[in-house]
UniProtKB/Swiss-Prot annotation:
One of its GO terms (molecular function) is structural constituent of ribosome. Residues 223-279 are annotated as: Disordered. The keyword Secreted does not apply. Belongs to the universal ribosomal protein uL2 family. GO terms for cellular component: large ribosomal subunit. The lineage of its organism: Bacteria, Pseudomonadati, Pseudomonadota, Alphaproteobacteria, Rhodospirillales. The keyword RNA-binding applies. Keywords: Ribonucleoprotein, Ribosomal protein, RNA-binding, rRNA-binding. Pfam families: Ribosomal_L2 (PF00181), Ribosomal_L2_C (PF03947). This is Large ribosomal subunit protein uL2. GO terms for biological process: cytoplasmic translation. It comes from Rhodospirillum rubrum (strain ATCC 11170 / ATH 1.1.1 / DSM 467 / LMG 4362 / NCIMB 8255 / S1).
Amino acid sequence: MALKQYNPVTPGMRNLVLVDRSDLYKGKPVKKLTEGLVKTGGRNNHGRVTSWWRGGGNKRRYRLIDFKRTKVDVAGRVERLEYDPNRTAFIALITYEDGEQTYILAPQRLQVGDAVISADRADIKPGNAMPLKNMPVGTIIHNVEMKPGKGGQLARSAGCYAQLIGKDAGYAQLRLSSGELRLVRGECLATVGAVSNPDNQNEKLGKAGRSRWMGRRPHVRGVVMNPVDHPHGGGEGRTSGGRHPVTPWGKPTKGKRTRSNKKTDSLIMRSRHLAKKKR
């Protein structure tokens, strides 16, 4: 979908660039495929802020997305494409031959009326899901499982995709958008195609209020806080923080690698931090 630019009839519209969503369905979602969504304001069950700069925003209903694609060997048809306020990608409403309906992530080039299926072997068409071991090398995929049956976890944001670059000893070799090369079990499911809405990264909100509508609050720097709030806080006048950049809890930030899952290190063939390690 194209980008929309606006005439600067107000200051907030001067730099406004939005994705044109005129082709999407304009009604409400299927009620049985949604559930209520309670706002947390970034607080956990103790009431403490664990995710800063969140709160407010328009009321939403959560759309239940089928990341597992467990409806095997039953053909479905794309009923409509919809906007989902809970994610950057668009979603597609699928109606199966037996009458059941589900939402899936909409890949690029998926059109209303297209047929999709989840099967052990299927055509290499956007929206079809199958195990990685049965896909040809070079296929562009998204919504990739990391454990068989767990549901897709990799390449789910707008415009994202992974590429199958090889198969060996029961594992599939994937190249991710980050540059990482990793192994995934061949039995894991993936969906053909790249995720929809690739122009999401080119959007410009134009004004702070549009960010607030999305539930994002102002991102305050640590150096302008008080010492009680942040290690960089305090000082008379403007200061630089006086130490290497750290998080509010004193851990190094700006590039410090924190990965500690040694069990799966053997599945990462090339780290996405390769250039950083050479420094």
